[in-house]
Amino acid sequence: MSTPRIVLGVSGGVDSSVAAWKLAQQGEPIAGLFMQNWADDGSGDCRAEDDRRDAVAVCGVLGIPFHFRDFSGEYWNGVFAHFLAEYAAGRTPNPDVLCNREVKFKHFLDAAQALGAERIATGHYAQVAHRGGRWRLLRGADRGKDQSYFLHQLGQAQLAATLFPIGDLEKSTLRRIAQDAGLPTHAKKDSTGICFIGERDFREFLGRYLPARAGEIRDPQGQRIAEHPGVFYFTLGQREGLNIGGVRGRAAAPWYVVGKDVANNVLYVDQDRDSPLLQSRWLQSEQAHWVTGAPPARRFTCTAQTRYRQPDEPCTVDVQDDGSVQVRFERPQRAVTPGQSLVLYDGEECLGGAVIAATDAPLERQLAGSSFSSEVVA
């Protein structure tokens, strides 16, 4: 078996399948590597085994070597333990960002280099360019599928060793290529949601690791209107799963989460989807990461996303002495959530990002700074 110059992460999905096909067409020695990032937990969810079989089948059709690596221990320590700690603290983490940084572009890269490869490739919708002496992370051509948001923690060494073969394709074109090439995954549906939860109920899954503690649901005036099964099951702006029935004297309208008092185990809700309690124009981050190794300036303007697929929002960024950033948006933002990722862009280029630590949303600021006072919030 010849030494591969490129090792592709094959997931068993159509995206990595077409990425493998494109590389195979170039005639360079390549190999596929399937990563198992989650150990069987006895739940009966065998999606990983199905994905592995599909990955083997694709490699067989293309005539490229198949490799398997079990990274479940690395995933648990580098991603899942952090995921649980964040939820226990009342924040809403983004495990896909951490998985890319800690597993796919760290342990996978190491495994590929151990096989003798010079570069790795993945089926992400993103692009890499070398400009001005630095490697740049660019959005994928299909803006609806662009995954640069999840890749913003990558650095120069990783980008220098990475290919994104499908970054210049639209999803519809990719599907046609897969069918025309006879790839067995051409009609396979896209995976969604958090990878280790799969099709399982999120609340039931999280409850296995974080003991549930029921508490009060209150309105902005502090009146108890219902009970929740645990504050960490909910995120700001959420509507689904509250199970609030008819409340006497209130309209028959949906309720939305507007605040989480983790210390006192209280969830706050409002019937206004765009409640002022959810609005913020300022946020403070944890330490920021810059794709090129440094920010464009100490203060600069750009656009930002505070959740995946959110429209770009103009903002001003101030880099702090400790490496964190403060961001002020031109217009109020709804449900900016601590624990989620702030990702910054200059046009098509992803500059980097950081974890959101705090915002100036009225209720969240109150709860972060002191015990809740209904007189202040109302």
From Swiss-Prot:
Keyword Chloroplast attached: no
Site features described as Interaction with tRNA, chain residue numbers: H124, Q340
Region (Interaction with tRNA): 145-147, 307-308
Family that this chain belongs to: Belongs to the MnmA/TRMU family.
Disulfide bonds: C99-C195
Top-rank lineage group of the source organism: Bacteria
Primary site of residence: cytoplasm
Protein name: tRNA-specific 2-thiouridylase MnmA
Cell membrane recorded as keyword: no
BP-aspect Gene Ontology terms: tRNA wobble position uridine thiolation
Residue ranges, annotated region (Interaction with target base in tRNA): 94-96
EC number of this enzyme: 2.8.1.13
Active-site residues (renumbered): C99 (nucleophile), C195 (cysteine persulfide intermediate)
Catalytic activity: S-sulfanyl-L-cysteinyl-[protein] + uridine(34) in tRNA + AH2 + ATP = 2-thiouridine(34) in tRNA + L-cysteinyl-[protein] + A + AMP + diphosphate + H(+)
Name of the coding gene: mnmA
GO CC terms: cytoplasm
Entry's localization field: Cytoplasm
Lineage: Bacteria, Pseudomonadati, Pseudomonadota, Gammaproteobacteria, Lysobacterales
CDD domains: MnmA_TRMU-like
Organism name: Xanthomonas euvesicatoria pv. vesicatoria (strain 85-10)
Residues binding ATP, per UniProt: G9, V10, S11, G12, G13, V14, D15, S16, M35, G123
MF terms in GO: ATP binding; tRNA binding; tRNA-uridine 2-sulfurtransferase activity
Task of the protein: Catalyzes the 2-thiolation of uridine at the wobble position (U34) of tRNA, leading to the formation of s(2)U34.
Keywords: ATP-binding, Cytoplasm, Disulfide bond, Nucleotide-binding, RNA-binding, Transferase, tRNA processing, tRNA-binding
Gene3D superfamilies: Adenine nucleotide alpha hydrolases-like domains, HUPs, Translation factors
